[in-house]
Amino acid sequence: MKIATYNVNGVNGRLPVLLRWLEENKPDVACLQELKAPHEKFPFQAIKGAGYNAIWHGQKSWNGVAILSKVGKIEEIKRALPGDEEDVQSRYIEANINGIRIVCLYLPNGNPAPGPKFDYKMGWFKRLQVHAKELYALNIPVVICGDYNVMPTELDVYKPERWVDDALFRPEVRAAFNELIAQGWTDAIRKLYPNDTIYTFFDYFRNAYVRNAGLRIDHFLLNPHLDKRLVAAGVDLNVRGWEKSSDHAPVWIELAD
């Protein structure tokens, strides 16, 4: 089973890129972030035409998450991260597909830091830690994937010295990610490639993609049920080079049946 995560940076504006990627790479499940579209503007018919069912949680102009599947019914569990009923940003959706609990998330950016946006990010992270612990306690396979807006280590960022005070790399943020790992979750990419330079995001400016000046901020966290089934993982870097592509590249894992 192949599961992918892709921050599409506007699902309608990048629809040709998304559909081409789905056709060429054929993930069984695809988790999308940054739809930047209200619920009624999600291109469901085009997605359906590509062979996928979908659930989504949209928001006008900002955020938005979706889960696509071509391998089974999508049973929606949640469409908001528990812990703050006043949080109306569309950043979280959770579902069961073929016996796997799949979480698709778009963690806040947090810049500028310090400030209210950074406080929101850290609060969101704390809520995620609480819910992740509950998910970990379930005796079922669970994956938490998406755009975490965190580079966990210096290996995950081009020229880390330039990012010391950024909300994606501040010590508090990296510590929060490591607290998730400490619960027992496996960072899928790092399990298979512990020492490789791997990036998933390349800024549109300064030819970042051409220079391989990137960040690794899109992650798969697996519980032990899925950790033992992990057979492959990677980044579809070539997609980032397509015309009118997102500034993220799709990331994927492959699980043994």
Regions found by a protein language model. Give the residues of each.
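Metal-dependent phosphoesterases centered on the DNase I-like endonuclease/exonuclease/phosphatase
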Residues: 50-51, 126-217
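Short, acidic/polar
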Residues: 12-23
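Acidic carboxylate-rich catalytic motifs and surrounding loops in phosphoryl-/glycosyl-chemistry enzymes
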Residues: 79-81, 187-197, 233-237
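Surface polyanion/phosphate-binding segment centered on an Asp-His-Pro turn
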Residues: 234-257
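Structured beta-strand-rich core segments of catalytic domains in phosphoester-bond hydrolases
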Residues: 35-38, 42-112
